[in-house]
């Protein structure tokens, strides 16, 4: 019974993490195409989403570890779980990189209001966001396929 509750909690937490990270590149693109008010909203909303993604990434890691230890530890789970844990750690690090990039751009944009600052980091945000989405695809596949 405890395992099932932990599993449901883990899936719910992971869904929030996925949802908060998947929309970031599109939000940035739409915010830059719109006017000043929308760009200001997009800048703060993107940072909020990155922070939320980081928090739920850590919670996913913790709930995943709880599931592993509920099963008896790492020697009792498959290689797919080991690989997924490593990829989750990489995604958390990527999120930290995204936050650092965006925080610098956010501060400069708030000081100057210059959209070109955001255009300059858009490519990096999309690139790191794309890496994160690729890792998501692999991790979700590993949760279904047993190795």
Explain the meaning of each model-derived region.
Residues 1-147:
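Polytopic transmembrane helical bundles with strong interfacial aromatic enrichment
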